[in-house]
């Protein structure tokens, strides 16, 4: 027969497993981008993994102090797009809302522009 102390330890262990096992982390699909304006202003396409109606962009490298204006588009229907959001060295992260319903599990890409020719930005984009 198991002692009370051992039963409590087993019960505590099982409870901890249930709590941590049921909390599955959810990660949105993210793609790295390397964009040069005006040369290559688009990110790789990536499927949107959730139904959150926002996109996220973070610059990790900026070749200059200019501003990069970013907008997310649905690949199959470019009438589905987000508001335009700016990132820069001093404000490298931003998020924007989609202007119409952005379906999950279809492909999106980010397009960007800057008034500063030759600006290069590397970073992450999550549709």
Can you name each region flagged by the protein language model?
Residues 29-127:
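Mature secreted bioactive peptide module from preproproteins
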Residues 1-48:
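N-terminal prepro-regions of secreted/extracellular proteins
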């Amino acid at each position: 027969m198991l002692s009370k102390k051992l039963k409590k330890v087993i019960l505590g262990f099982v409870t901890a497993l249930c709590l941590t096992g049921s909390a599955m982390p959810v990660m949105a699909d993210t793609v790295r981008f390397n964009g040069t304006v005006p040369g290559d202003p688009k990110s790789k396409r990536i499927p949107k993994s959730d139904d959150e109606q926002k996109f996220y962009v973070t610059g990790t490298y900026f070749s200059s102090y200019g501003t990069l204006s970013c907008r997310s588009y649905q690949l199959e229907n470019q009438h589905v797009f987000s508001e335009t959001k700016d990132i820069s060295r001093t404000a490298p992260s931003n998020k924007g809302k989609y202007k119409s319903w952005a379906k999950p599990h279809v492909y999106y890409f980010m397009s960007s522009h800057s008034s500063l020719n030759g600006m290069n930005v590397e970073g992450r984009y999550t549709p």
